[in-house]
């Protein structure tokens, strides 16, 4: 059950020859979500093979380089004959701006579009096994959110060898005990689930910051994350500029990753001055947090489960 993250746009503020502006897709069990939708996102989706059958789009904030692609994306979906509803999630007090952007050109969509405002600290439940949590970031006073994609804990690993030793026939009884039910065998023995099933296992956690200064909100949300996607607009030599504009340097992002104990850091939102050559940013970040990658348009990150489930009974 891999989880696939695709970087559709990795530039800061404006597109360059090498990079489009902000957009990230996440695909899990056939469902695709989009985080931010900078101009030209629908073309990037075509280019990198991302399905247009999105269920939701999450905006970190509504600055133009994260927003202006939604008009074209909705138009493309309408031309493709979409009828399914689409939900757009956006920070508190930004729905009006988002609605105005959608209505540019005066064309109606062929499907319902629902706009939902979110507060920091809220949670969007996705079925029974994962959710999307919001957290506060610091982008020079702009209404902004970061998002944490959080899978619920999974059942512990089932021990098939011990089950056979105990004389439990393979089949429905294995599934019942793995779901936590005690079972009674024909000889009257009662076997508790804890005998055959290990401790519950953590789900995956992916954190997307959007535009931000280093902040406590990100640090808390990123604790033990499998993947932290942090903006990195500038190198350390432009630290004053980063502070002035509400952005982060590569070193600052790496320091957050180190403090939070994340497994992997991917940097995005790269200033045009580094668009072709990101070596300085990469070296700066890796000097603090070695497991760092600077994303390019088309970069894919696949996160497998920490343990294979092939031997798990149904």
Swiss-Prot record:
Residues bound to Zn(2+) 2: 65-66, 211, 269
One function term, GO molecular function aspect: 3'-tRNA processing endoribonuclease activity
Residue numbers binding Zn(2+) 1: 61, 63, 139, 211
Cofactor note (record): Binds 2 Zn(2+) ions.
Alphabetically ordered keywords of this record: Endonuclease, Hydrolase, Metal-binding, Nuclease, tRNA processing, Zinc
Listed InterPro entries: Metallo-B-lactamas, RibonucZ/Hydroxyglut_hydro, RNase_Z/BN
Top-level EC class: hydrolase
Protein origin, superkingdom: Bacteria
Catalytic activity of the protein: Endonucleolytic cleavage of RNA, removing extra 3' nucleotides from tRNA precursor, generating 3' termini of tRNAs. A 3'-hydroxy group is left at the tRNA terminus and a 5'-phosphoryl group is left at the trailer molecule
Cofactor (UniProt): Zn(2+)
EC number: 3.1.26.11
Active site: 65 (proton acceptor)
HAMAP family: RNase_Z_BN
Function per UniProt: Zinc phosphodiesterase, which displays some tRNA 3'-processing endonuclease activity. Probably involved in tRNA maturation, by removing a 3'-trailer from precursor tRNA.
Family: Belongs to the RNase Z family.
Assembly and binders: Homodimer.
Protein name: Ribonuclease Z
Origin species: Gemmatimonas aurantiaca (strain DSM 14586 / JCM 11422 / NBRC 100505 / T-27)
